[in-house]
UniProtKB/Swiss-Prot annotation:
Taxonomic lineage: Eukaryota, Discoba, Euglenozoa, Kinetoplastea, Metakinetoplastina
Compositional bias annotation for Polar residues: 7-19, 503-519
Biological role stated in the UniProt entry: Facilitative glucose transporter. Binds D-fructose and cytochalasin-B, but not D-galactose.
Region described as Disordered: 1-24, 503-543
Highest taxon listed in the record's lineage: Eukaryota
Protein name: Glucose transporter HT1
Gene: HT1
Length: 543
């Protein structure tokens, strides 16, 4: 299988510093060729696992709420299938164990599902694991390589999935959290490794297209989880523990299968041609020195990367995903049906990014779409929802359209371009460290949103039990303002790393650096351009 060079070499064997995109498309294989599909399988498998793990939370919590509703169980066999329930032979009823046989069905229903603390632990366990995994991803990739990262991720994913199966059978929260934490470690590693593998090994003609597939299949995984959950709750017998338990196990088995697929991927995928000094694959030519640039030299790109992570998370994508089912409920839709509709729209809009990246630069898409998403948060999801601004009917319509616009803008450019930008902001030798930091930053912001959003909504709305419209409105106004601030900073400082620019790494210096119209030999100066800046096959619109 051919390996596409990332740098040109001259007669003396020294690198000329040219970008992969400087190579012509004459030797480009078909997109559906074997060698190209070998690269495509990486973002497809890793993105699907990432997406299903994200979509897992809302669906599983809903299924568990049904499963743990003891009063709905009508036989001793079904009741014994739930470790938190007990069967009362005298009146042939199933009650919550904490009821001690004295309480009625209404009290037992109060014990179904997770409480607020348990829900928080369940939701955040994977994100915390992802943050920790991304912290160590850079060192791990430099030492053991990309191929080994997929193998280790597959093994950890299988172990984590096995614990989730055990926790589902015994309704044990702490085992579930440990399993989700291990899955988080996997995702923290693959969110760095998968985009890096594509960046280092894909043919220049397809690098951006394949690069966005990680986000596209992340949205596919989220949608698949939502649709599978909808199918489960629409089948007869789903409200009985004896019938629901095996359905929940089937739902959990998707993560197991995807983790096994990741392990197989690690075993069969070819090694990346990029290796780092001090690593297990450091023999041979073209080895990169991970210590070529210090963190101090890279403070500028790292700061810009943190701002892009803020755009990804602090504009409220996770809050929108949580708020969307309630919006659908408000306009008369079933919550699970509404959730499936929103996640399907999320996937469809992500598909649009595939043709867009061949027409525009990553920078152009990211900037334009971040501005559009921020405006949607501020003007459509924020201000109109504030109590008294609009009637209830108009408010719901505008907010629903606003969420649709926000999701579309996010998937057109913000989500799809983020993981590619996390690579191209840094020189190749610094990418394990730089990309690891940027991905870690977005997980930190993710945790902040998951923890602070419900608290903020409740506090601004006047406390528990109050109508949430005021708190939701103010929250989305804040999201919009944060997005606008990030947009202004990125408009000034978001530029990809250019080979040969040396250590002038401050954002200001990089933005103000002059660009020569040619390379001294009458040819356009595309040699120093990163893939982020290659807007079209003719390189006609670098932003």
């Amino acid at each position: 299988m051919p390996e596409y060079p990332t740098e040109d070499t001259n007669a003396s064997g020294k690198t000329s510093g040219s970008s992969p995109d400087d190579h012509t498309d004459d030797n480009a294989p078909s997109f559906f060729s074997c060698e190209n599909l070998c690269i495509v399988q990486v973002p497809v498998s890793t993105g699907s696992l990432n997406g299903f793990s994200i979509g897992f939370v809302a669906v599983y919590m809903h299924l568990y709420e049904i499963f743990s509703g003891c009063s709905a169980l009508e036989s001793s066999g079904a009741c014994s299938g739930n470790s938190k329930c007990t069967w009362i032979p005298n009146n042939s009823t199933c009650v919550w164990k904490d009821c001690n046989g004295a309480a009625g069905a209404t009290t037992c229903k109060d014990g179904s599902g997770y409480n607020s603390l348990e829900s928080g632990l369940f939701a955040c366990s994977m994100i915390v694991g992802s943050m920790i995994g991304s912290i160590f991803a850079g060192k791990f990739l430099s030492k053991f390589g990309l191929k080994m990262s997929f193998i280790v991720s597959g093994v950890l994913g299988i172990v984590g999935s096995a614990l989730i199966h055990v926790a589902t059978r015994g309704s044990t929260l702490w085992v579930m959290c440990v399993g989700r934490f291990l899955m988080g470690l996997v995702l923290g590693l693959v969110c760095v490794a998968s985009p890096m593998y594509v960046n280092e090994n894909a043919h220049p003609k397809y690098r951006k297209t394949i690069g966005v597939l990680f986000q596209v299949f992340t949205t596919f995984g989220i949608m698949f989880a939502a649709l599978l959950g909808l199918a489960i709750v629409k089948t007869p017998g789903h409200d009985k523990a004896s019938g629901l338990l095996w359905r929940m196990q089937v739902f959990c088995s998707v993560s197991t299968a995807l983790s096994a697929l990741l392990l197989v991927l690690g075993l069969v995928v070819r090694k990346s041609k990029t290796s780092f000094a001090g690593g297990v694959d450091s023999a041979g030519e073209g080895v990169l020195d991970p210590n070529e640039y210090s963190v101090r030299q890279m403070l500028g790109p790292l700061a810009v990367g943190a701002v892009t992570a803020g755009t990804l998370q602090l504009t409220g994508i996770n809050a929108v995903m949580n708020y969307a089912p309630e919006i659908m409920r408000n306009i008369g839709m079933d919550p699970m049906e509404g959730n499936s509709a929103v996640m399907s729209w999320n996937f469809v809009t992500a598909l649009v990014a595939i043709p867009l990246v061949s027409r525009f630069t990553m920078r152009q898409l990211f900037l334009a779409c971040s501005f559009m998403a921020s405006c949607a948060c501020l003007i459509m999801c924020g201000i109109p929802v504030y109590p008294g601004v609009a009637s209830v009917d108009n408010r719901n319509i505008v907010a629903t359209v606003g969420i649709a616009v926000f999701i579309a803008a996010f998937e057109f450019g913000v989500g799809s371009c983020f993981f590619v930008l996390a690579q191209d902001l840094f020189p190749r030798s610094f990418r394990p460290t730089g990309s690891s930091f940027v991905v870690m930053a977005q997980f930190i912001f993710n945790i902040m949103i998951n923890l602070l959003y419900p608290i903020t909504v409740e506090a601004i709305s006047g406390g528990k039990g109050k109508s949430p419209e005021k708190g939701q409105s103010v929250s989305f106004i804040i999201f919009g303002i944060i997005g606008i601030i990030c947009f202004v900073l990125q408009l000034r400082y978001l530029t990809p790393w250019e080979d040969g620019q040396g250590t002038s790494t401050s954002p200001t210096a990089r933005c103000n650096a002059p660009t020569s119209p040619n390379n001294g030999e009458g040819e356009p100066a595309t040699a120093d351009m990163s893939p982020v800046e290659m807007s079209t096959p003719k390189h006609s619109g670098a932003a």
